């Protein structure tokens, strides 16, 4: 359903967000 797709997108987006935050901190 909708929540399943959102969960998949969220899981894929998390690593990108973390990498962006790490780059900003550096």
From Swiss-Prot:
Source superkingdom: Eukaryota
Tissue expression per record: Expressed by the venom gland.
Keywords: Antibiotic, Antimicrobial, Cytolysis, Fungicide, Hemolysis, Membrane, Secreted, Target cell membrane, Target membrane, Toxin
Single GO cellular component term: other organism cell membrane
An annotated GO BP: defense response to bacterium
InterPro entries: Antimicrobial_4
UniProt-annotated location(s): Secreted; Target cell membrane
One GO MF term: toxin activity
Protein family: Belongs to the non-disulfide-bridged peptide (NDBP) superfamily. Medium-length antimicrobial peptide (group 3) family. Ponericin-W subfamily.
Function, in words: Has a broad spectrum of activity against both Gram-positive and Gram-negative bacteria and S.cerevisiae. Has insecticidal and hemolytic activities. May act by disrupting the integrity of the bacterial cell membrane.
Entry protein name: M-poneritoxin-Ng1c
Organism: Neoponera goeldii (Ponerine ant)
Biological classification of the source: Eukaryota, Metazoa, Ecdysozoa, Arthropoda, Hexapoda
């Amino acid at each position: 359903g909708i929540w399943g797709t959102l969960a998949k997108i969220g899981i894929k987006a998390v690593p990108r967000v973390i990498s962006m935050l790490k780059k900003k901190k550096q």
